[in-house]
């Protein structure tokens, strides 16, 4: 169920402060964050975030198409190595 429109998008307070500081200083350094749950706002376009995926920080450059999505959507947490090979077919060869 989506978030109520009257509440507005959720963005962590500490992340808002970092974004405002970066925009006011026109600072283009990477903003490190653990806040995967924060929604991407229009003010964040053009900034680069280092989003934590549980193991390391993934760099995410924000574009206009990302506005309205969550930061965590762009830093995958699971690694897919492929399905296990069929042992029977390998043994016959």
From Swiss-Prot:
GO terms for cellular component: cytoplasm; small ribosomal subunit. The keyword Transferase does not apply. Gene3D superfamilies: 30s Ribosomal Protein S19, Chain A (3.30.860.10). GO terms for molecular function: rRNA binding; structural constituent of ribosome. InterPro entries: Ribosomal_uS19, Ribosomal_uS19_bac-type, Ribosomal_uS19_CS, Ribosomal_uS19_SF. Keywords: Ribonucleoprotein, Ribosomal protein, RNA-binding, rRNA-binding. One of its GO terms (biological process) is translation. SUPFAM superfamilies: Ribosomal protein S19 (SSF54570). It comes from the Bacteria. PANTHER family: RIBOSOMAL PROTEIN S19P FAMILY MEMBER, SMALL RIBOSOMAL SUBUNIT PROTEIN US19M. Protein S19 forms a complex with S13 that binds strongly to the 16S ribosomal RNA. Belongs to the universal ribosomal protein uS19 family. HAMAP family: Ribosomal_uS19. This is Small ribosomal subunit protein uS19. It comes from Nitratidesulfovibrio vulgaris (strain DSM 19637 / Miyazaki F). The gene is rpsS.
